[in-house]
Amino acid sequence: MLRQLYQSLALVAAVHATGIFANGVDIESLFGPYLSPGTEIAEPTDADFSTVASPRWSEWKPPTWTGAIKPKTERDLQKIVRIAAAHNLPFMATNGGHGTSLIYGTVKGIDVNLENFNSVKIDIEKNTLTVGGGTKLGDITEPLYNAGKAIPRGNSPCVGVIGATIGGGIGFNTGLFGLGVDALVEVRLVTATGDIVTVSEKRHPDLLWAIRGAGANFGIITEATFRMSDQPNNGDAVIGSFVYPAEGALAVFEELQSLDYVLPADLGVQLSIAYNRTINASELTVDMKHFGPWDTFVPHWNTAERLKPIARTIKNVTLVELYAGLDGPCQSGVYVSGGTTGLGRTDPQTMKEVMDEMTAFYEAHPGFLGQTLFQRYANNNTLKTPLSTAVYPWRDTKNFWLHENIYTDPALEQPSIDLLLSLRKKLQATSGFDEPHIYVNYAFGDEGPAAWWGADNLPRLRRLKRRWDPKGLFGRGTPIF
C-alpha cells in the first residue's frame, strides 16, 4: 500500500513538473518583470539560493526546488500564483519548513518563501490577534504575554503559527483553550485564481470550515486572525521534568492511564522515550507544563516523586521562558521522519511493548537518535466545540503519539521507517478507535485523506476542493484526493 501510494504521487508530481523547466525557461525572466522591488528570486545554482528558499528542518525526503521566490507584498503572491498556474508550474508556499510527510519527497517546483509576511497585531478592543503568513510561534509569545492574552497554540517557537493551526493546532495549553482552529476566526487567502478573499463565519463559511483542518489545500494564507483569551495565572507557570529508568516505566504508564478521564485543564503532559548513550539504557522522561500556581502543581509533583525518578527539574517560569525552552524541533541538518496515531485510551502494556521495541532498536542501531512521544492534553474544551465547525475530526483523541526518527546516516532510513510502522500498528490496535485518528500535522503520509480528515467529511471537502482549487495547485504535502 505504501509503495503504491508513493509511486502514484510521484507520477502525479512528475507530470506537473514537466513542461516549462524542460524547455529551459528561467524563473527570473518569467516572474521578475511583474514582481515588486525587493522581491528575491533565485535558481538552485545561484549562490544566494539558500537565503531565498525557506530553510528546512529535516533532510529526509525534501521537496526538489526548481527555484525560489521570496515575495515582498500580497500583490506579489497574487502574481506568482497566476503566472505559475498559467505556465503549469508547481509551487509551494513555505514558512517554518517543518513538514515531514513522505509526500514532500515527490514535490518538484518553486519554493515561495513567506518570510517577509511576518507581522503580529493585537487589538485589545476586538480581543483579536492577527498574524502574517510568515509569522512563527516564537514571534507571538512575548507580544501576547505583554498584553496579558493567550491563544491555543503549538509548542515549538520556530514552527509557523498558521501552519501549526490549520492542521488542528494542539499544544501544552490545549486543555485550557481547546484547538487552534477553534480560535481561528478569519483569514485572507490568495486563491487558485490569484484573487484575494476574506474568509470568516460570515463570508465563505464553508471555506472556513475546510481551512480549519485542511487549510493548506485551498490557497496561501497571507493573514490570520484569532480570538484571544485571558492569559492564565498572570503569565506564570510551573514546569517539571522527571526521568525514569526503563524498569520503572510500566508504573508511569499506569499512572498516565489514570489520567484518561481526570486530567486537569491547566496541566499538559508529555512522555518521551529516548536512549541514554552514556549509560546505554532507555529512559522515560515525563514533562509537565502547569499553567497554574505553585500550590496546585504540588500534588502532581508528589505523584511524580512517588514513581521514583532518577532525576528531576522543577522551576517557576514565565510563559515566555516556558515556550523559549521548547526549541528542540528547531535544530536542523539531520534526517527526521515522523508518524502518529491518536489514542482514545491509554494501554500501559502496549506502551511498555513500544519502549521494549525502541530499546532493541537503539541497541541494534547505535546511530539512531530518535524518540517516541506521548502528548497528553485534556480535551474537555476541545469536545465542547461542535464537530460541524471544522473539518478537523478527531476531538475525542486523548493522547497524541508522535514518533520521530532522527539520524545522520542515510542507511538508517528503511530500518527506522519499519520501526515507525511497527509501533504505529501496535498502538492503533489498542487505541480504542476502529479507524485511525491521524493528526495531519504529524502524518507520515501513507494514511490518506480519510485518516486525516474523517471519511464522513470527505464528500464535502472534495466538493470545496473542486470549487476553490480544481487544478490542485495547493496542499501538495497532504493532498485531498
From Swiss-Prot:
InterPro entries: BBE (IPR012951), FAD-bd_PCMH (IPR016166), FAD-bd_PCMH-like_sf (IPR036318), FAD-bd_PCMH_sub2 (IPR016169), FAD-linked_Oxidoreductase (IPR050416), Oxid_FAD_bind_N (IPR006094). Residues 58-231 form the FAD-binding PCMH-type domain. Gene3D superfamilies: 3.30.465.10, 3.40.462.20. It comes from the Eukaryota. Coiled coil: none annotated. Disruption phenotype: Does not affect the production of azasperpyranone A. PROSITE patterns: FAD_PCMH. Keywords: FAD, Flavoprotein, Glycoprotein, Oxidoreductase, Signal. Induction: Expression is induced by the azasperpyranone cluster A-specific transcription factor ATEG_07666 which is itself regulated by the azasperpyranone transcriptional regulator ATEG_07667. It holds the Pfam family FAD_binding_4. Glycans are attached at N276, N280, N316, N380. Azasperpyranones display potential anti-cancer activities. Azasperpyranones A, C, D, and F exhibit potent growth-inhibitory activity against the A549, HepG2, HCT-116, and HL-60 cell lines, with IC(50) values of 2.39-14.42 mm, respectively. Moreover, azasperpyranone D significantly inhibits HCT-116 xenograft tumor growth in BALB/c-nu mice. In addition, azasperpyranones A and C can bind with four kinds of therapeutic targets for cancer, eEF2K, FGFR, survivin, and TNF-a. One of its GO terms (molecular function) is FAD binding. Residues 1-17 form the signal peptide. It is an enzyme of class 1 (oxidoreductase). Its EC number is 1.-.-.-. Belongs to the oxygen-dependent FAD-linked oxidoreductase family. FAD-linked oxidoreductase; part of the cluster B that mediates the biosynthesis of azasperpyranones, members of the azaphilone family that exhibit anti-cancer activities. Azasperpyranones are synthesized by 2 clusters, A and B. Cluster A is responsible for the production of the polyhydric phenol moiety while the azaphilonoid scaffold is produced by the cluster B. The non-reducing polyketide synthase ATEG_03629 produces 5-methyl orsellinic acid, which is then reduced to 5-methyl orsellinic aldehyde by the NRPS-like protein ATEG_03630. This is FAD-linked oxidoreductase ATEG_07660.
